[in-house]
Amino acid sequence: MSATTRKHAPTVEAKGFRIPIVGLGTWSLRGRDCARLTEQAIRIGYRHIDTAQMYDNEREVGEGVRASGLRSEVMVTTKVQPTLLAPHDLERSVKESLAKLRLDVIDLLLIHWPNPRVPLVETLGVMAKMKHEGYTRQIGVSNFTVSLLDEANRISTEPLVCDQIECHPFLNQDKIVGACRKHGMVV
């Protein structure tokens, strides 16, 4: 099977940013298998790779992306763990993620879970700063409720492009999907 390019992969658009519809979630992958599977997924046409600090596999994901030779065609998403959302911790952790991934930029940086102990305005301020400084192309959230989506979109100085949530026929998320649509975000 020949590889497809990112521009030919089916995508959704949020606020001018195109996100491949199908992505490889790496939450259960570890070690050499993670690197090999990531590389092979890209070679057969996957153009979105999803990882997170909590998965403890950013190094292997980055290895697989680089080994594919197709970095410019692949969107890499990573997520900041909730215990690292305070401004100093967040900035340091994003730089550590980039170092582990060994990439020049993160394509999409998400807050993995909200942390009620850290003011959202502070977290989003640092995420916007990381975008302005070129550490990430876009920012978004994961596992946010409708009320948190409303608050985040009200206070963020940068557009939030998505709320990554579990969504399938056995888990109705219509209210969150509706809130995302209202704010021009994708799920």
Where are these regions (language model features)?
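Short, acidic/polar
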Residues: 29-42, 85-102, 122, 147-151, ...
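Structural motif corresponding to the early beta-alpha repeats
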Residues: 75-92, 101, 110-113
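Active-site beta-loop-alpha junctions enriched in small/polar residues
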Residues: 27-29, 52-54, 79-83, 111-114, ...
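Conserved, mostly hydrophobic/aromatic
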Residues: 24, 41, 49, 61, ...
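Beta/alpha (TIM)-barrel catalytic core signal, keyed to glycine-rich beta->alpha loops juxtaposed to Asp/Glu
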Residues: 114-187
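N-terminal binding-site loop/beta-alpha segment at the start of enzyme catalytic domains
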Residues: 1-74
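Acidic (Asp/Glu)-rich catalytic clusters
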Residues: 13-16, 40-43, 62-73, 95-104, ...
